[in-house]
Amino acid sequence: DPRYQLHGTDALRDWMQERADEVIAAMADTHFDIPEPVRTIECLIAPTQTGGIYYTGPSDDFSRPGRMWWSVPKGVTEFGTWRELTTVYHEGVPGHHLQVGQTVYRRELLNKWRRMMCWTSGHGEGWALYAERLMAELGFMDDPGNYLGLLDGQSLRAARVVLDIGVHCGFEAPAEVGGGSWTYDKAWTFLRAHSNEGEEMLRFELNRYLGWPGQAPSYKVGERLWLQLRDEAQQRAGDAFSLKDFHRRALDVGSGGLDVLRDAVLD
């Protein structure tokens, strides 16, 4: 479908920037308090060629803004946006950029280590998955193609959990890939069956989770906690509940363990 196609890396970079800027304009002062320095994000094509999108935080004084990078595999010049809009929300706004940028900004609340160095996967990646779901709830993914991209991402993340736990805890592989002990080839077949990502991206994902035990489940555990926190905060506050106030209070905690986050937000 040409509606979801981009041609060339310049068009890809511009599309990323436009999506990020429009969300900042829509979200600031409505669903989020976004400090002025955090309202700038720079979207770039990464020098690496591994596939995927990632985020790097701003400098302490925001002279270098937060940046969202797309690592384009060598030779790839055509891009489908239907799968990637949800990833832009994950890595950019209201995902990692808002989360990390606000933490860096809160120097009156957090020490330098908490602002610039601390990262807990369940907290950070859980927030980014929560951000994806929030954007769907707010109507930003009502287009069927873009919503299909959200579901495709959820399928991959669920498959990664199965792979991570199965490989690192010694469980048998599913019957669909032959059962028995997990092997690289069985893991590859399993990922291919449960995601529409390109080969370069899936190879990157497979190598990542073979060598990083526990990271894949942390995404989903963290997402579940963020959703539970919001629901519980809303139940306690009733009609006085403010989504913007909830987000500000939760993000002001900075990165930390999930128990710490729960206690700080609900106590």
Label for each model-derived stretch:
Residues 1-267:
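Long, His/Glu/Asp-enriched segments that create or flank divalent metal/ion-associated functional microenvironments
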